[in-house]
Amino acid sequence: MHRYRSHTCGALRESDIDQTVRVSGWCHRIRDHGGLLFIDLRDHYGLTQCVADPDSPAFKDAEKLRAEWVVRIDGKVRRRPEGTDNNDLPTGQVEIFITEIEVLGPAGELPLPVFGEQEYPEDIRLKYRFLDLRREKLHQNIMTRGAIVDSMRKRMKEQGFFEFQTPILTASSPEGARDFLVPSRIHPGRFYALPQAPQQYKQLLMMSGFDRYFQIAPCFRDEDPRADRLPGEFYQLDVEMSFITQDDVFAAMEPVITGVFEDFAKGKPVTKSWPRIAYADSLKKYGTDKPDLRNPIEMQNVSEHFRGSGFKVFARMLEEERNQVWAIPGPGGGSRAFCDRMNSWAQGEGQPGLGYIMWREGGEGAGPLANNIGPERTAAIREQLGLKAGDAAFFVAGDPSKFVRFAGLARTRLGEELNLVDKERFELAWIVDFPMYEYNEDDKKVDFSHNPFSMPQGGMDALLNQDPLTIKAFQYDITCNGFEIASGGIRNHRPEAMVKAFEIAGYGEQEVVDRFGGMYRAFQYGAPPHGGMAAGVDRIVMLLCGTNNLREISLFPMNQRAEDLLMGAPSDVTPKQLRELHIRLNLPEN
């Protein structure tokens, strides 16, 4: 018999009754039923009930066991007594009568119990992550993550893609976040950077004559903590293709992502044919570029009904051309109590309030706005929005670029409060036609709005002759249930267009050459049209595991202060290490 096991803890069935077996694992739970000891033994594969009575030669050893001790158990498989089956376990019809126990690894007092799913402070969970990972739900999430990545790889290869590995040590480049820098010992005063994404390398692969690249790529960004992103690193399904259009990328990737979701959606419906929503339309309808399409509410511009009306606040605003009034329908929200609750919520979000109209059973509008604009305008708003008696509409006004984010929050809030969101489905969509540039209010300059390597719609002509803030890019995102899960674009593969695109964003040609020298040189020697995308593995896994916390699907994550509490990173290093790197610390005063 094998030194440690003849079977795993998830393997035994009724067909194994009367066999002598050996299992090894952790003591998951120990129960004393009046002299009868039950030990639930757990390993990676499952749970097996083991039992010892005073007649067992191993009874005294069994009495000494404690939770999470690692043991080897020998014994005979027998049928559980009638009425004690556990149908929640694959091994739930049998148990092992213990004849011998060997302690392989005793455990001290546990700072974090493994049995059960009690909530514990995050810092305790991260410091003792090896215990946390033994817990069933987190353990299963990690296994699901591995299976999702396997599904991605399989589907990419079925689409004719080939997996490559690109360098981890590379050059620093401006890609939207701070780099993690790695000092060079051989070249004092110079630094490598960990890649924020394999962007340049995957484009260089296309210029090297390869096609249909993919990689499950680690990416590193030195960003301030955010609720929807882990500090430090994340993984993406990185993709690039040659001689393709935007539609070709969509045709290749839609079945991959749809298939992965269908594999792990546990029967929840998944969008079959994805809608394509222009960025500007997404903002107007949903107040965000990552809409949750499970929420049926669509906002509309109702400015014409308030222009010159008796509601002077909105009427005066509309005298300025850039201002608008948007309506957010609230089906079923036509009660004074609900409207007042939404108004209070808006004030809690820093707004002066949230104007509303309710429609009574007779069809007449009610509320301060309705009283001010009169029944004719109120009826026209109701007709435009397709509302009925018992419904309401809420209004935001001013410069849309200033209020759009709040309008999106209000739409989300209404969908949740009115139970309009179907939580049991996955709604996927393409968001297209992103602006190439945006105005950076902090730096008072035009900046790239997304990927700086994207092709502008209209090409060089647009870069030379259009107002930069009106140029659209061949840039696209994939959204699911209110999350951006992928982003991509068709690349700018002509060197003169690349230089001009960066020039508009304030980078001179020499700076482009200095920062992107490898790619700039490659563009001089025949670059094919190419494009691709990157899908966030972590966010996809998070959605499919049904959690809102990325730490619940990551093996050894950092905390929100970018600290690895298990390994003690970031850590001090020795003076000798600093001398070898020619680094002298100049720390801020506390």
Swiss-Prot record:
It catalyses: tRNA(Asx) + L-aspartate + ATP = L-aspartyl-tRNA(Asx) + AMP + diphosphate. The record marks H33, G83 as: Important for tRNA non-discrimination. Disulfide bonds: none annotated. It is found in: Cytoplasm. Residues 199-202 are annotated as: Aspartate. GO terms for cellular component: cytoplasm. The keyword Cell inner membrane does not apply. L-aspartate binds at E175, R221, H450, R491. Its EC number is 6.1.1.23. GO terms for molecular function: aspartate-tRNA ligase activity; aspartate-tRNA(Asn) ligase activity; ATP binding; nucleic acid binding. Keywords: Aminoacyl-tRNA synthetase, ATP-binding, Cytoplasm, Ligase, Nucleotide-binding, Protein biosynthesis. The keyword ATP-binding applies. ATP binds at R221, D222, E223, E484, G536, V537, D538, R539. Aspartyl-tRNA synthetase with relaxed tRNA specificity since it is able to aspartylate not only its cognate tRNA(Asp) but also tRNA(Asn). Reaction proceeds in two steps: L-aspartate is first activated by ATP to form Asp-AMP and then transferred to the acceptor end of tRNA(Asp/Asn). Belongs to the class-II aminoacyl-tRNA synthetase family. Type 1 subfamily. NCBIfam families: aspS_bact, PRK00476.1. Homodimer. This is Aspartate--tRNA(Asp/Asn) ligase. It comes from Rhodopseudomonas palustris (strain BisB18). The lineage of its organism: Bacteria, Pseudomonadati, Pseudomonadota, Alphaproteobacteria, Hyphomicrobiales.
